[in-house]
Curated annotation (Swiss-Prot):
Record protein name field: Biotin synthase
Record region (Disordered): 1-21
Cofactor, how bound (note): Binds 1 [4Fe-4S] cluster. The cluster is coordinated with 3 cysteines and an exchangeable S-adenosyl-L-methionine. Binds 1 [2Fe-2S] cluster. The cluster is coordinated with 3 cysteines and 1 arginine.
Substrates-to-products reaction catalysed: (4R,5S)-dethiobiotin + (sulfur carrier)-SH + 2 reduced [2Fe-2S]-[ferredoxin] + 2 S-adenosyl-L-methionine = (sulfur carrier)-H + biotin + 2 5'-deoxyadenosine + 2 L-methionine + 2 oxidized [2Fe-2S]-[ferredoxin]
Pathway membership: Cofactor biosynthesis; biotin biosynthesis; biotin from 7,8-diaminononanoate: step 2/2
Binding site for [4Fe-4S] cluster: C77, C81, C84
Domain Radical SAM core: from-to ranges: 62-289
Known EC number: 2.8.1.6
Length: 360
């Protein structure tokens, strides 16, 4: 089984490069937490300039992908994630529902496509799905793909055979977020370990499914802990093809109600650093967009975000209305279509910046 390599925060990049050269192997430079903290500490304009340069090297800077996320099974989750209104551990007034019928999901996908989405994501609030749950979900995947939409599901932890079954159904992406850094993780979740998450990501990768993996900021973590999350993501080998960055949406009844909100510029910095450290990933502006004004959203696009979740609801929290999204993108001159990745420049640094030398 191919192991997802997570580099320790204290990795000495220069020494690692020398060892690799001596062994005749090629390996990308690894991001230390200290490197990422240094990016956070750059003057804001310098960071934005570097992020935009990186973005333009790898993508059309005036294109974003519209994604729609549908909750196909809401509430009743046995996990205790402190941010989540779907947990049975929190009294949020959310009513648990059973898995949606396949025809209703496909009808929602049809509407999403008519509204301009090119990616359809389906989320179910489970710790881990039973095998019997996956049969109708495979039908959903096949039906959505038949419409020409990119497919993504998030169902919790997976076993090896389950990941393989989803791949055989044609699944494009599996979402399983790390949520936060290893150091802060215990403050947020106790029912699932960090290694549990990494194990599921490994099974997804081994099955040949693209990885969608990001996190949430504004949970009460420090800047260094935010940097720790980015380091974990960027040092995956390979890093995720899709990186959703969520801004905490506080829901009454969850333990994080009343948490001090993250500074808006710090959120933009996080988007920019995700772009710099994972230059060829789709960086998705995800939950929390409703609490951002239009200028802040535009700044996130400038920082390198090239996908938004589009529609009136994002799982169990609200999202800017579709018409407002269309008008904003039009005013910014941004086209809503599948983002086009630029050809890889084999001679340059894969990280897309002058901070790292290209591997020898």
């Amino acid at each position: 089984m191919t192991q997802l390599n997570i580099a320790p925060a204290s990795t000495d990049t220069a020494a690692a490069s020398n060892n690799n050269a001596a062994a005749g192997t090629k390996q990308l430079a690894r991001w230390r937490v200290a490197d990422i903290v240094s990016l956070y500490e750059l003057p804001f304009n310098d960071l934005m300039f570097q992020a935009q340069q990186t973005h333009r090297e790898h993508f059309d800077a005036n294109t974003v992908q519209l994604s729609t996320l549908l909750s196909i099974k809401t509430g009743g989750c046995e996990e205790d994630c402190a941010y989540c209104p779907q947990s049975v551990h929190h009294d949020t007034g959310l009513q648990a529902d059973k898995l949606m019928p396949v025809d209703e999901v496909l009808a929602a996908a049809k509407v999403a496509k008519e509204n301009g989405a090119t990616r359809f994501c389906m989320g179910a609030a489970w710790r881990n799905p039973k095998d019997r749950h996956l049969e109708p979900i495979k039908d959903m995947i096949r039906g959505v793909k038949a419409m020409g939409l990119e497919t993504c599901v998030t169902l919790g932890m997976l076993e090896t055979h389950q990941a393989q079954g989803l791949r055989e159904a044609g699944l494009d992406y599996y979402n399983h977020n790390l949520d936060t850094s290893p150091e802060f993780y215990g403050q947020i979740i106790s029912t699932r370990t960090y290694q549990d998450r990494l194990d599921t990501l490994e099974r997804v990768r081994d099955a040949g499914i693209n990885v969608c993996c990001g996190g949430i900021v504004g949970l009460g973590e420090s800047r260094r802990e935010r940097a720790g999350l980015i380091a974990q993501l960027a040092n995956m080998d390979p890093y995720p093809e899709s990186v959703p960055i969520n801004n905490l949406v506080q829901v009454e009844g969850t333990p994080l109600t009343g948490t001090e909100a993250i500074d808006p510029f710090e959120f933009v910095r996080t988007i920019a650093i995700a772009r710099i450290t994972m230059p060829r990933a789709m960086v998705r502006l995800s939950a929390g967009r409703e609490q951002m004004n239009e200028a802040l959203q535009a700044m996130c696009f400038l920082a390198g975000a090239n996908s938004i979740f589009y529609g009136d609801q994002l799982l169990t929290t609200s999202n800017p209305q579709a018409e407002a999204d269309r008008k904003l993108l039009e005013r910014l001159g941004i086209r809503a279509e599948a983002a086009q990745q630029m050809p890889l420049d084999q001679s340059g640094c894969e990280h897309g910046c002058d901070k790292h030398a290209a591997p020898n």
